[in-house]
Amino acid sequence: MLTASLYKQLPVLTTTATSTYSFIRLSSTLATPPHSTTTTSPSSPAFHQPNHPQQFANPNTSVFDVSTRIYTQEGIDNNNDTKFLTKAPYPHPVFPQDECENVTVTHRETKTLGDKISFRSIQFMRQCFDLVTGYAVPKTNNPDEFKGTRWEMTEGKWLTRCIFLESVAGVPGSVAGFLRHLHSLRMLRRDKAWIETLLDEAYNERMHLLTFIKIGKPSWFTRSIIYVGQGVFTNVFFLLYLLNPRYCHRFVGYLEEEAVRTYSHLLDELAVPGKLPAFETMKIPEVAVQYWPELTPKSSFKDLILRIRADEAKHREVNHTFANLEQKTDRNPFALKIEGLNKPQPNHGINVMRPTGWEKQDLQL
């Protein structure tokens, strides 16, 4: 016979066992997809998540790697966004192939204290950026000088550098255009076409960025740097433009000099067969074909970089010229072509271009 104490404990044991069994059955039910009568093995296609690993040309990177994952041609085609496309508010001028190839690396010598501060600031920013991204210009003509070291530039590192550069370069034009817009409203007078060119510049830089992100997927580490960097740089540039817009334009002129130098280095590496194989066979994304009038679906990555470098060279000329002008009274010489002049004047193209900027005495203002 059962004792009274043992008899009282039996329901407790039974209840605990029943609850445990029910919990196990519930867990098993939740772990099994509803209305599923087949067993899924790790080797079956349904087991794997649809992350499309075949769309990337380079393998997975480490968590803190700044390299961008390059899409295969299939990945680029799948990422083309052709829905609800609108015409560009600032149509891109035609840049002939020979004029794009004739763009050179130049430097405007510093003349004033403001010039020196602007130039040194750019050099400091570049050195920090080079250190983080593992970038270095070869000191010799040997393209394999840094092969096997952290300074070797791969397709992923090149694209990271381009993406970060364009995310920064798109800020000054929009900030300067916004502040000049407010100034025009506040002072109840014309801006003399500075705003249009500045916003065109910002739009152009953003199109560079939108093109690059169709070619590769930045790492989360790169995205975090861009997120923080944009917040800091935008606010600092905003305050400095209020204080001294002339030297802010000089700063951007030197920034564009570095952009031209970077893209020229990239073009040099593209000229070496087998150096950047993923870029050699790549067809450009649809957004580039829609924006640059000379590009076609058959254009190469090199054709794209030639146009982007030409854009940066134009921004270099524009900002160095703006820094030479009277900020509140002079007109924008790039906005209007004056007929009947017997001397060259700035225009939207790159056929008549002064890389270090136009001096004020040479302009019809």
Swiss-Prot record:
Its EC number is 1.-.-.-. InterPro entries: AOX, AOX_sf. Fe cation 2 binds at residues 205, 256, 312, 315. GO terms for biological process: alternative respiration. Pfam families: AOX. The chain crosses the membrane at residues 220-242. GO terms for cellular component: mitochondrial inner membrane. GO terms for molecular function: alternative oxidase activity; metal ion binding. It comes from Candida albicans (Yeast). This is Alternative oxidase 2, mitochondrial.
